[in-house]
Amino acid sequence: MSGILGKKIGMTQIFEDGKFVPVTVVEAGPNFVLQKKTEEKDGYVALQLGFDEKKEKNTTKPLMGIFNKAGVKPQRFVKELEVESVDGYELGQEIKVDVLTEVGYVDITGTSKGKGTSGVMKKHGFSGNRASHGVSRNHRLGGSIGMSSWPGKVLKGKKMAGQHGNATVTVQNLKVVKVDAEHNLLLIKGAVPGAKNSYLVIKPAVKKVIG
């Protein structure tokens, strides 16, 4: 399995080898297979998974058609995950957190906390200008944003003030401390993106951990 959908519950700490280890508790599953995407029909191979049951009255008719066909109740978080093959999977099949039992490290994708419109000092860590000595009303400004008549524009990627957070973020190589199959919980060492109760995509780590 290439991954599983989950929800961030919060952070706590456990005692391991004589040391406190900060961990994030993630509710991972059960997921349900809603659709199977094939190379012949869709041009790619993937599974559409659903997680976190919700009320039918809050579900659109197109989505209800998908849920009814799979024989599952409406799910709040629906996402496609690429797999090598859809063979062995059936519509409505339940996928639990134990698929990650043998996985030591994971990559987790979530939506970071939104912080609204922020200036360059908060958003990018600029040091700002001096408090006095020639500085007038420019203490927290970003300074020059480009050249003059050539190129006559602000270059792409220039760090400026604007929306801060509320973006898709992936954190790689997070250690799986414990898999609680009975309660569908994952204990992940360290922090993961997003606020409490935000949704996550958990996949086996792509990169190898050295050492």
From Swiss-Prot:
GO BP, one annotated term: translation
Q: Where is this region: Disordered?
A: 116-142
Swiss-Prot/TrEMBL keywords: Ribonucleoprotein, Ribosomal protein, RNA-binding, rRNA-binding
A GO cellular component entry from the record: cytosolic large ribosomal subunit
Q: What InterPro entries does the record point to?
A: Ribosomal_uL3, Ribosomal_uL3_bac/org-type, Transl_B-barrel_sf
Q: Which GO terms describe its molecular function?
A: rRNA binding; structural constituent of ribosome
Top-rank taxon, per record? Bacteria
Q: What does this protein do?
A: One of the primary rRNA binding proteins, it binds directly near the 3'-end of the 23S rRNA, where it nucleates assembly of the 50S subunit.
Quaternary context: Part of the 50S ribosomal subunit. Forms a cluster with proteins L14 and L19.
Give the NCBIfam families listed for this entry: L3_bact
* Family statement drawn from the similarity comment of this UniProt entry: Belongs to the universal ribosomal protein uL3 family.
Q: Which PANTHER family match?
A: 50S RIBOSOMAL PROTEIN L3, LARGE RIBOSOMAL SUBUNIT PROTEIN UL3C
Name this polypeptide is given: Large ribosomal subunit protein uL3
